[in-house]
C-alpha cells in the first residue's frame, strides 16, 4: 500500500463538503463523524497485473466542463421573474372566466402540454371536481367523440374513476367504433392509453384508432392540416401519457404558436416559464459539473461513459419543477455514478474484481475497500461512498431523518443485480425471459432511482411511505419492467455486439425460437399491457404514495421511452438526444419585444 496521497487521484475533495455547516446537535455530530469524506490511498496490488479487458469505445461527451461553466442566461434577472409572476396572476383571473365545460377541459389540456399545469394545480383540481361531480348528462357523451375522449383522459389522468362505457354511444350494432372525424379519433387514441386490464372497450378503441391513424398517415389527406399531421405522427410514435412533460412542452409551445386559436397570454407565459426554468437548470448544471470534475472519474476512468448532461436530462425529466433543485442534483450525480459502475460491470471489470466490489458495497467498510479493490475501483467506490454519506448527512441535518441504511440497501440491490448479469455473461448463460426480467427490473435502476427521488425530493420523509417503496410494490415492479424493456429495445443490438448478457429480446428469441422482429413486437405488446397495471395503481385511492412520488415514478418510465425510442440515447448520444438536450438546456425560446395582449380567455381564441 502506498503511503502517500496523490491529490490528482482523490476521489472527492474536502471542498465538496465546505458548504455543509457544522452539526447543531449531538446526534448529528455523531452521524457526521460516521459520514466524513475519505481520501483514496492508491493500492498497487492489482495495478501492475496485465488483464485483458473489453472496451466499448464510448465517445466522449460533447458537453464538456468548460462549455457548461460558460453558460449564462438573462432569465435569472428580477425583471423576468416579476413579469412571470404578473402573467400567472392574469392567467388565474382568466381561468375563472372560462365557463363552458369543454372550454375548461381544453384549457387544462393546453396548460398541461405547455408546461404550466404545476402553476395552477388548485384551479385545475377545482374545474375537474366540478365536471366530475356535475350530474348533468353532457350532450358530447353521445355526440362528440373528441370531447368525450378528452374528458375521459383528463379525469383518469387525475385519478377520477370513469367508466369505459362512456364510449358505447360511438359504436355500431356489431360493436365496432363509428367515427370519420380525425380529431375525435386522435383524441380517443390518446385516451386509450389510460385503460386498465380487462377493459375490452378501451382495447378495441386502441386497435381501431391505431389502424385508422396509420391509414391516414399513409394517405395524403394530412396536407390540409399540418398541425394535426404532426400530432398524429407523434401520437403513433409515443402517446401523451408516455411523454415527459418538459419535453412535450418545448415541442407544443412551437406548435401552439402556429395555431390560429392560440391564446397570447398562455403563449407568453409558457415561453417565460420555459426560459426561466432553463436558466435554473443551467446554474444547477454548472455546480454539478464542478463536483463531477473534482471527483476525477471522467478523466481517470476513461473506459467509462462520461454522461453528466444526459444524467441531468434524466433528473430534469423526473422532477422538472423549480422546487426540486436538490432532488435533481442528487439524481444527476447518482445516475452519473450508476453509468460508470454499469460500465465496470458490463465491460471493464473482471469477474473476480466485480465480486470484490459487490462485497465492498455490502460491507460498506472503507478499510476493506482500500485493502482489496484495484485502483480504478477505489476511485469509483469512494466517490459513491462519500456521495451517499454526504446525501445522508444533508437529509439528517434538514429533517433529522437517518436514511443511510435505506440508501445503502438500494445501491446494494443494484450492484448485486449487476453481478448476476456479469456471471450470466461469463458463463454464457441465457436465462428465460421471466428470470431475466426479475433481475432486470433491478439492474435497470428503477427501484434505486425512485428511492433516491423520494428521499431527495420529499420533505418530510414519511417512514410508512419509504417502507412501502422498499417492499417492491406493484407500481415499482411494473414500472421498472417497462423501463427495462424499453431500454432493451433501444440498446440491445449495440450491447450484444460489444459483448454483454442477452437482453429481453434475445431471451425471448432463445426461449421461443421467434425471429427478432416478432420478439421486438412481443416486447412492445408487453410494455403496453404493463402500463395498464401501472394505470390501475395510480387510480388506487388507498395508495400510501403521494401524488408527487407517483409522478416521479411515472416520469422515470416516460424518460426511458424518450431515451431509448431511437436507440441508446444515454450511452451513444444519438442525434435525437443531442437535439433535445440542446433545445431544453441551452436554447431559450425567443420572446416578442413588446408585451402580448391579455384580453382573451385561455380556453378560447385569442
From Swiss-Prot:
Q: Predominant location of this chain?
A: plastid
Molecular functions (GO terms): (R)-limonene synthase activity; magnesium ion binding
Q: Give the enzyme's EC designation.
A: 4.2.3.20
What this protein is called in its record is (R)-limonene synthase 1, chloroplastic
List ligand-binding residues for Mn(2+) 1: 342, 346
Q: Which UniProt keywords apply?
A: Chloroplast, Lyase, Magnesium, Manganese, Metal-binding, Plastid, Transit peptide
User: What GO cellular component is one of the record's annotations?
Assistant: chloroplast
Give the EC class as a word.
Answer: lyase
Its required cofactor(s), as named, are: Mg(2+); Mn(2+)
Give the domain note: The Asp-Asp-Xaa-Xaa-Asp/Glu (DDXXD/E) motif is important for the catalytic activity, presumably through binding to Mg(2+).
Q: Where does substrate bind?
A: 342, 346, 484, 487, 503
The record's annotation in Pfam families points to:
Terpene_synth, Terpene_synth_C
Q: Which reaction does it catalyse?
A: (2E)-geranyl diphosphate = (4R)-limonene + diphosphate
| Binding-site positions, Mn(2+) 2 | 342, 346
| Annotated binding of Mn(2+) 3, by residue | 487
The free-text note explaining how the cofactor binds reads: Binds 3 Mg(2+) or Mn(2+) ions per subunit.
Entry's localization field: Plastid, Chloroplast
Which family would the database say this protein is a member of?
Belongs to the terpene synthase family.
Q: Where is this motif: DDXXD motif?
A: 342-346
